[in-house]
Amino acid sequence: ELGWEFYLRPENDAHKIGNHIWEIGLKYGMILTGTPVFRARRIEAGLMGTTEFDSTTTPFDAGLGHFVQMDKQNFIGREALEKADKRSRTFGMRVLGGIAERGRTISIGDDLIGTVCSSTWSPYQECGVALVRMDDPEKGPSTEVKVTGTDGKTYSAKLCSLPMYDSEGAIARGKNTTIPNGPQPWK
């Protein structure tokens, strides 16, 4: 899952450079990937993007409260943040046998308790993975839930902490270069 992105100037021959990198990389087991793999890694790492935020999301909701300097004398939004719940409501979710559909609610029995912010298949974990926002911060890691998948079926899932694995960042630093061989349903 170690990967690189290359940014070139307009005057560079991107096709020629890409072919050269590909030829050399094949000798070392390089494979081409795309958006689904990067989406999986982003979700597994707990990196949030546009679908994880809306106008009501506080830094605390997103698990980013440690970046808020409440001891600063004054800043825009301070009063609202002082009143806000300081607990994180953002967690990971592993879906057994399917991929949760983004925007769907998460439930326990008849109770709707959260929302899927983003999701995909994880070839590394061999299950669907998602970033979710819970209504109640107490419904966190190890909570077993139900969610609707991209195929319309209902799946069992379990909430988990973020990052989902590699909390030491070994993959990003190139210290873990294991390539998963699990199923890849986006092919």
Task: Enumerate the language-model features and the residues they cover.
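Conserved, structured C-terminal
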Residues: E1-K187
